[in-house]
Amino acid sequence: MEKMIEIKEISPDLVPQKLLLEADPSIERVNQYLEGSLCYVAVIRKEIVGVCVLKLIEKNRIELFNIAVLPENQKSGIGSQLLQFVLDNLREKNFESVELGTGTFGYQLTFYQRFGFRVDSILKDYFINNYDEPIFENGIQLKDMLRFILKL
């Protein structure tokens, strides 16, 4: 039986920080970009299972800072449904582009490219210079950040 997913916009102060920390291990950085952000959540049976946080860069450009799904709900299409909803919503609001930054390896590279995101630039040593603790993914330390952009 397919789960009924409701996707809606909510206030940043209602977003569960634990869920945001699934995608970004720095509570300080999360709190920085959360203030004044645009937040969407995926809800199943009244439980928030996914979140997407964006912030205005300038008039028609927005940055996706965080997209996360609870571990027990991952690989079930929730993240894809959430991102598609957000992108459709941004198009309706006449945004021109969405930007994001992520590590240089991992499943998220394929995930974003399936939606049409293209690599725009590389920020060398970003994760080394901007996080107090090293971040490891699949046993490999994240060092550089890939910047992606999607023209809407």
Predicted regions and their residues:
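Conserved catalytic-core motifs of GNAT/GCN5-like acyltransferases
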Residues: E99-G101, Q113, R118-G139
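Short acidic/polar active-site loop segments enriched in Thr and Asp
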Residues: N60, E96, R118
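Conserved N-terminal entry element of GNAT/NAT acetyltransferase domains
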Residues: M1-P12, L146, L152
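Conserved acetyl-CoA-binding loop-helix of GNAT-fold acetyltransferases
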Residues: K75-D88, R114
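Conserved GNAT acetyl-CoA-binding A-motif
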Residues: L90-G103
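Conserved beta-strand segments that form the floor/walls of ligand-binding pockets within enzyme
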Residues: E63, A68, G77, E99, ...
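Short hydrophobic/aromatic beta-strand or adjacent loop that forms the aromatic wall/cage
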Residues: S37, L142-R147
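Acetyl-CoA-dependent GNAT
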Residues: I5-N66, L70-P71
